[in-house]
């Protein structure tokens, strides 16, 4: 799952992005924009990197340094002699600008139905060096010692088109296989975030160990399409995994009886959802999988406060605010009823507080509601309501295949210590003793060995995915999947 704020948009759990696909321009025209450009919107600096790719097309990425977001791929770039148009999927936004001269673009940034001015200025080589792409030594690069095929396929009624990469060994087969399932938000097949590509790292490692790996673009990322309206929930994304599962079973190089699922965060919610109704899923690996959507959201609010030394009173106050918000997200039918319910509960809570607390840090009802107002439309999405109601036990009680559940000890987005115990006990109570759980010391939500272990640190770390966690996964698969 994702958790990174971009301008007015929140993405639950582990912030991720879409795979870059660029539109065609000639090398000569594309080179007009090549370089690093900078602009500011709502006090937030944005950095655009444009380059002419091997095919002569302009490609781009965007950074938001203040938010710790780097390497956000631009889905399409269309360049003419005097203009540029960019489309992004995370955030869902666009940028259109006129080229005033070699160093200035005058344009508009559009996001969430709003448009605002955003002018970009080309940075000098010295300035651009400050925003150079971060070092990511684990990201695999060709040539690979295995097959790596770009594939595309549709769901049964052709309403969803999925783009993916299938990797598999050059010799032998048919191979045991696994589908990688991303966390929440719009993510590409590599689960790209902060310049890291953890799914590319996992796929490379497992393929070298003799497995086939399918990693898939989310809807509206990379080559994938499909409905992403306010009515779409995790259940719809589970159906996309079912589509991938059916496609993979039909491939001649794949052992159809040995296909499993590896899910990260929200993807680890989806894995048991699919396995509960598809008894031919051979195994599950859960990476930071939540036991309860509601409790995970509360944990995400409180754990950072504890980490930064907030007082007990302030933490208790924050918990009440969070619970008021969550209660009304479930009961409200629209933004107006949500705000009305929040106002009523919050005022009742304040009336019972001592004056000392109200004076120190408690927000007035007006300020509290003002802080929620920009988010209300997003909080009314069906996706959030499904998340709040999600309970892993509803699915794990029906899972009969082997399960490996891993969590990082330093994760501040999912309470792994308690959730791993819950997953273990739930499976065993349901008669499935083929479960292994492990809380890996020193790892964060992205399975990086961390120092400060904050969300802001994700992009500062060079490690994309812990070699220790990779080895645990590979060894477990060798024992439980290969035969």
Labelled PLM ranges:
Residues 24-100, 106-111, 145:
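Central antiparallel beta-sheet cores of small beta-barrel/beta-sandwich binding domains
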Residues 129-173:
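N-terminal cap/lid segment of alpha/beta-hydrolase-fold proteins
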Residues 174-184:
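Short beta-strand element of the alpha/beta-hydrolase
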Residues 192-213:
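Short amphipathic alpha-helix adjacent to the substrate-entry channel of hydrolases
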Residues 231-252:
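Alpha/beta-hydrolase active-site loop
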Residues 287-397:
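Accessory cap/linker subdomain of secreted extracellular hydrolases
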Residues 399, 405-407:
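Short beta-strand/loop motif that positions the catalytic acidic residue
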Residues 412-420:
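Conserved alpha/beta-hydrolase "acid-adjacent" motif
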